[in-house]
């Protein structure tokens, strides 16, 4: 990963290797090191008051990830604090800011009215894949599916939960929190989300009709 040298000021060269190793756990399809690299590449051209702090938060924001768990962000924030305090010349204020950024990724819009400018930046970068090309989005959607099914949900559970999440996103006044994020990604994100909802509901409808037909056939056999 090539980043501006000032983003690594005061940090041991092995800091990134330590973070990268955490992303090598089994079962990851989307929340991988490639996701981090993609976010960091977008940060290079994204307005930010403290890009070094946003960068360090991005590096650790999905370091701990188990599908279905609700404490991934807290565990990732703890790992970030422990690693950075040991391997970087970094202040307590900066560590607190990094922790808040990582914890904010737990629910991207729940705290939207209380976020700092750079907390909004990291959230937009984290979701920027939503506004990618259709091919990029299709790969993302498949990767999310493969992380959850069957590790944390059945196919039907995933489709229902995913559709609900996407509908909530589409109902928001803005998918992205910053003016720059909205300018770059809001319109394509809405088109991609609407496409995925159509795909999910069509397949869910087919599955429900198929199950209903099987049940009717079984009932006829019993009678």
Question: What is each model feature region?
Answer:
Residues 39, 51-67, 76, 98-106:
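His-Asp-centered metal-binding catalytic motifs of divalent-metal-dependent phosphohydrolases/nucleases
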Residues 14, 49-50, 71, 75, ...:
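Alpha-helix N-cap and coil->helix boundary residues
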Residues 25-38, 65-78:
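Active-site metal-coordination segments of metallo-dependent hydrolases
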Residues 2-3, 24-31, 41-50, 60, ...:
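Divalent metal-dependent phosphate-bond-processing catalytic cores, especially two-metal-ion Mg2+/Mn2+ enzymes
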Residues 22, 76-111, 167:
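Histidine- and acidic-residue-rich, metal-dependent catalytic cores
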Residues 1-17:
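Hydrophobic, proline/glycine-rich low-complexity stretches
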Residues 46, 65-70, 87, 109:
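Amphipathic alpha-helical interaction segments
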Residues 13-20, 33, 37, 55, ...:
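Short, well-structured alpha-helical segments
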